């Protein structure tokens, strides 16, 4: 009887160890959704990221998180949108550190696991010149899916990894990480 209880206890501990060692199937962040204005995917994406960090840090969203105001400030008619460099400058002016880089699947997963949403530039099929910005908020490695806050469509839009990578590779996998500057940083 005593050995049966010990054996049962060992099985429970082993089972818990196995369960807790497994990584979650889907990693996603609850990033607020902002619907874009016409040709305003960049400004909506900026607003979503700022609102996410404001929520994480427990602070009121500032004026800098208003997509309409961002659009008025940064929109370039000849570009049909916002330049990537202007997005970075906007974040920096609002006390964010920015890192633009050529992303890949592994980097997306790493940043999301650390609680960092990413803005990605896509060139959807059929678009001749303009880019489309989305916020990558989750990945499901088992199903090869991404979860996007697509300002033109909806929150938590599921997209197949292969479709995403095709549209992303047309922009050389342009990715933007914006994180708040540490307190006292400047």
Positions of PLM-derived features:
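Stable alpha-helical elements in mature extracytoplasmic
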Residues: 37, 42-49, 66, 70, ...
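A generic structural signal for short, solvent-exposed coil/turn residues
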Residues: 13-18, 90, 112, 128, ...
């Amino acid at each position: 009887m005593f050995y049966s209880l010990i054996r049962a206890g060992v099985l429970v501990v082993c089972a818990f160890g196995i369960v807790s060692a497994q990584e979650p199937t889907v990693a996603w962040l609850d990033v607020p959704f902002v619907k874009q204005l016409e040709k305003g995917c960049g400004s909506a994406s900026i607003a979503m990221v700022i609102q996410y960090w404001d929520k994480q840090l427990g602070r009121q969203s500032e004026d800098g998180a208003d997509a309409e105001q961002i659009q008025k400030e940064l929109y370039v008619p000849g570009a049909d949108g916002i330049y990537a460099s202007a997005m970075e400058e906007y974040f920096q002016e609002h006390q964010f550190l920015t890192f633009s880089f050529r992303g890949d699947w592994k980097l997306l997963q790493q940043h999301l696991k650390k609680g960092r949403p990413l803005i990605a530039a896509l060139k959807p099929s059929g678009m001749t010149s303009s880019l489309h910005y989305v916020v990558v908020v989750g990945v499901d490695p088992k199903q090869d899916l991404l979860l996007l806050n697509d300002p033109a469509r909806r929150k938590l839009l599921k997209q197949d990894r292969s479709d995403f990578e095709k549209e992303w590779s047309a922009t050389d996998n342009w990715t933007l990480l914006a994180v708040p500057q540490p307190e006292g940083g400047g």
